[in-house]
Every structure is written in structure tokens, then in C-alpha cells.
Amino acid sequence: LDRATQLALVAAHEAMTEAGISGKPEDAHRFGVYAGVGFGGAQTVDSLYERFYTLLHDTSQPGRNPTVMHPLSVPRMMANAPAALVSMRYGLNGPSNTYSVACASSAVALGEVFRAIRDGYLDAAVVLGTEAMLTPGALMAWNALRVMARPNVTDPARSCRPFSKDRNGFVLGEGAAAIVLESEARARARSRQALSELCGYGCS
């Protein structure tokens, strides 16, 4: 699995555990997975290019074919892989949707779940956001945009200062987060204490 998917599975596990859900829910057909993913399988893509160009120029291994890749390369790199794997892990048969809206991807995923529950299409969903782009190719691509922060040599932790007046760019990171969003009726039926309430959503 690509690292972005691995991170998503861990986050989803924590969210499901927090929500008191283990195994396949009885209402799995009304339980979806909505993911926000900006790119997806960056690690997989980078490793494919590395293998291809290494074997293409490696004269010490004349019998190795640089075009022969792992048969699951495409499913690993697809942006919908995290949502698909979480759906399969928990046997969730509701919609498995992925939104790619740059930095707003997981926020849009959350809002669309809100609408689906409000309008009666779903009762619950795992909402997740994941990204893992700490690869040579991704770092060079972001650096080419001239948006990366210049490193603070004396205190590297201060390189990322998005709200400072002397900020000079951002620091690329990786991670995943997930929550379980469900209708109030479903939460009450399970005698679960809600951690928060989502009251609205807009997107333009």
C-alpha cells in the first residue's frame, strides 16, 4: 500500500474505535467513506520512476526489463485507494467517494457527508483526509513553484510559520485524520455521546 493509504487506515481505525464501532456495522449499506486526497500515491509514483530509470540505465543487469512493474501499481497510486481500502476493511457498503480540491479536499469531504446525512442518503460515514508527498519528485516539484520556506538554520522548527509577518513559505508534511460523522438519531440509538455537532456547510 502507498503510505497515504497506510496513514488513512490508521486514522480510520482510531476514528472507528473512538466511535465505539468494531467490525462491520449492521447498517453498513447506509455507512459510507468520504475521503479528501489532494494527490494520492506519490510514494508509489516516485518508486515506479526510480525503478524504471534505474533499470533503464543499469548495464550490469541486462536481463531486467524496466517496463515490468508491480501488478498493483495502478490501484496503489489512485487517489481513491484510501477510501476504497477503508470501505473494504470495515465492510462499509455505502458510497465510497474521494474529493480532490487541493488544500480543501477533506473539508469538502466532510461537508458532502453532512449534506448526504441531512438529505437522507446516509446515516453515517468515515470522513478522512490523507496525504504523503515527502518524496524526491514531489519535493522538487513543490520547490519549483518557489513556495517552500527557506530553512531556519538556527531553529529548524521555526521554518514553518504560516501566521507570522515574516513568513517566507510553507513546509511540506504528511499525515492523516479521520472522524465518524453520523446522524443524531443514529448516535442516540447507540447511546453514544457526540463530541461535536456540524451545523452547516457551504462551498463556492
Cite the ranges covered by each PLM segment.
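Short conserved active-site loop signatures built around small residues
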Residues: 106
